[in-house]
A protein has these predicted regions:
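Macromolecular interaction modules
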Residues: 1-107
């Protein structure tokens, strides 16, 4: 199963408490309805990021994806588009996001 990580930065002036409330009340709930997502959590970054102390990142998302093609379709769906609209219109500084997809190395 692929895992996508998204490292994010709040827009200037956005209250972290408001963003985290939106995560719990909206984002997590919508993610659970998308067929491609097996699990999704966002983690608050605490302390410096060694090697990138000035990056300004605040959160890292971990998204377990069942099927990448379906994931792209889910993001393009009305629910996915509304989620992304709210996320980037109200909370996150999109140009400062870093994301990558991984796959576990089997034993």
């Amino acid at each position: 199963m692929k895992v996508r990580y998204v490292i994010t930065t709040l827009k200037q002036g956005v209250d972290a408490t408001a963003y985290e409330r939106w995560l719990r009340e909206y984002d997590y709930k919508v993610a659970k309805t998308l067929p491609s997502i097996a699990s999704y959590t966002t983690h608050r970054i605490e302390g410096p990021i060694h090697g990138a102390e000035t990056a300004g990142w605040n959160y890292i998302e971990r998204i377990e994806i069942r099927d990448m093609d379906q994931y792209q379709r889910d993001l393009a769906s009305p629910a996915g588009q509304e989620l992304l609209h709210q996320l980037y219109e109200n909370y996150l500084e999109r140009p400062r996001n870093v994301f990558f997809t991984t796959e576990a190395i089997a034993e």
